[in-house]
C-alpha cells in the first residue's frame, strides 16, 4: 500500500495509509513515486547535521472543494542527525481555501472552493539566484539561505539556514503567496502573503483575507493524539504565579486563539520518544501579525484551530462544522489539523491612488500571516550547540 500512497501524494491526492511507528523509509520507492523530491542537508556547507526530505507538487484542477488548487507539500520527512532514521512529519499540507469577506457584508469570496484559482507564473525576477533562488517549475520557487541568528550567548553565536518553497495563487486582482519554510532545526512555517490591486470599483472597502490550512500531520506514523495548550495567569494575583495546561482532545473539535492564553496545538505519537525518554511532539503555533485573528458570520471562522479524524474526502474548510459533527474520536488516530490565519486590510494611500479620471493605480504591498510547527523534545538536545551530550 505504501507504493500506492506515495503515488497519490505526488499527483496531488492525499491518501494516508497506516505505517508502523519507526518504520524505515523505503528510499527507492519514495524516489520512484516522488521524482521531484528535495533532499536538503543543513548546514549547506560542511558535514550534514540535519536533513529534510520533501515531496511537493502542484494542483490545478476544477474542483478545489475535493482537491484544493495550489502548492501541495508532502509527504515530508526529517532526520535529526546523520545516524538517525528519517521520521515522517506530515503527509499533505496545503491551503484549503481563502475566504475574503468585505465589511459592507458583500462580496464574500471563496477564492479556491468557488473560483478554483491556480498558481501564477514565476520567473528569475521572482526567484533570483542572489538570494539562493532556483525555479523548480514555471510556478514554484525554491530558496535556500541564511535565516538569521539561531542562538547567541556569552561566548559564541550561530546563524541558521532554511529552505523555502513558494508559489502564488492568481486570484484575479490579488496574488496569494503560498510560502512554506523548512528550517535547519526541524521547524516548519506556513505563510500567507496577500498582495495585488484593491477590489476594482471599490478600492477603499475594508476587508479580511483569511487562509485556512489543512495539515494531514503524521508524526512518526498515523497514530497521533492532540492536546490544547494554553497559558493561564491572573494579572491581579499578587503571588505572580502562572499555569500552563495541556488538555487532551478526545473528540473532533475546534477552539479559538487568544493573545493572553497563547493557545496552541500539541501533536504526539504514543511510542515516539527521544533518548531522554520524553514524549516527542510538534506544536502548531500561530504567527499572528496585525493584532489578531478575525471571526465572521460563517461558522467555520468561529474557531482558529480544528482537529478532525483523517478522511480523504474532507478538504473544504467551510465544511469544518460538519466534519466535527457527532464528535468523532481523534485520540490515537490518524489526524488532520486545521489553522486559520487572518489579515485585516484597511486600505491606505500606499495601496494606490485615483488619477484625475478616477482610475486606480497601485499595488498593495505584501501583508503576512501564518503558523509554525515547532519541534518539542524531538531532539535529545540541541545538535547546534556543542557539545550535545
Specify the residue positions occupied by each region the protein language model found.
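Extended effector regions of multi-domain proteins
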Residues: 17-178, 183-187, 199-389
Amino acid at each position: 500500500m505504501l507504493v500506492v500512497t506515495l503515488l497519490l501524494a505526488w499527483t496531488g491526492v492525499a491518501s494516508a495509509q497506516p505505517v508502523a511507528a519507526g518504520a524505515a523509509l523505503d528510499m527507492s520507492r519514495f524516489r520512484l513515486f516522488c521524482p521531484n523530491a528535495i533532499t536538503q542537508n543543513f548546514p549547506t556547507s560542511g558535514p550534514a547535521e540535519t536533513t529534510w526530505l520533501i515531496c511537493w507538487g502542484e494542483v490545478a484542477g476544477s474542483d478545489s472543494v475535493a482537491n484544493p488548487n495550489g502548492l501541495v507539500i508532502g509527504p515530508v520527512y526529517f532526520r535529526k542527525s546523520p545516524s538517525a532514521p528519517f521520521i515522517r512529519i506530515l503527509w499533505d499540507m496545503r491551503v484549503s481555501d481563502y475566504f475574503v469577506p468585505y465589511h459592507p457584508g458583500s462580496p464574500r469570496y471563496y477564492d479556491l472552493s468557488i473560483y478554483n484559482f491556480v498558481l501564477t507564473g514565476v520567473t528569475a525576477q521572482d526567484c533570483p539566484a542572489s538570494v539562493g533562488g532556483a525555479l523548480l517549475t514555471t510556478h514554484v520557487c525554491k530558496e535556500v539561505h541564511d535565516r538569521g541568528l539561531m542562538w547567541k550567548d556569552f561566548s559564541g553565536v550561530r546563524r541558521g539556514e532554511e529552505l523555502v518553497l513558494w508559489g502564488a495563487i492568481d486570484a484575479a486582482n490579488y496574488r496569494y503567496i503560498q510560502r512554506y519554510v523548512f528550517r535547519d532545526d526541524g521547524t516548519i512555517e506556513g505563510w500567507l502573503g496577500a498582495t495585488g490591486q484593491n477590489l476594482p470599483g471599490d478600492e477603499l472597502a475594508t476587508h479580511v483575507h483569511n487562509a485556512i490550512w489543512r495539515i494531514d500531520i503524521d508524526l512518526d506514523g498515523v497514530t497521533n493524539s492532540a492536546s490544547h495548550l494554553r497559558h493561564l495567569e491572573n494579572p491581579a494575583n499578587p503571588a505572580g504565579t502562572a499555569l500552563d495546561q495541556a488538555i487532551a482532545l478526545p473528540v473532533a473539535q475546534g477552539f479559538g486563539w487568544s493573545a493572553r492564553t497563547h493557545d496552541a496545538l500539541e501533536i504526539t505519537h504514543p511510542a515516539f520518544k527521544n533518548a531522554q525518554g520524553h514524549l516527542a511532539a510538534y506544536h502548531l503555533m500561530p504567527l499572528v501579525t496585525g493584532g489578531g485573528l478575525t471571526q465572521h458570520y460563517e461558522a467555520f471562522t468561529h474557531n482558529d484551530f480544528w482537529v478532525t479524524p483523517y478522511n480523504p474526502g474532507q478538504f473544504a474548510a467551510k465544511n469544518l462544522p460538519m466534519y466535527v459533527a457527532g464528535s468523532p474520536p481523534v485520540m490515537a488516530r490518524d489526524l488532520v489539523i486545521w489553522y486559520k490565519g487572518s489579515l485585516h486590510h484597511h486600505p491606505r494611500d500606499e495601496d494606490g491612488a485615483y488619477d484625475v479620471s478616477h482610475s486606480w493605480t497601485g499595488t498593495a504591498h505584501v501583508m503576512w500571516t501564518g503558523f509554525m510547527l515547532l519541534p518539542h523534545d524531538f531532539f535529545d538536545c540541541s545538535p547546534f550547540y556543542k557539545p550535545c551530550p
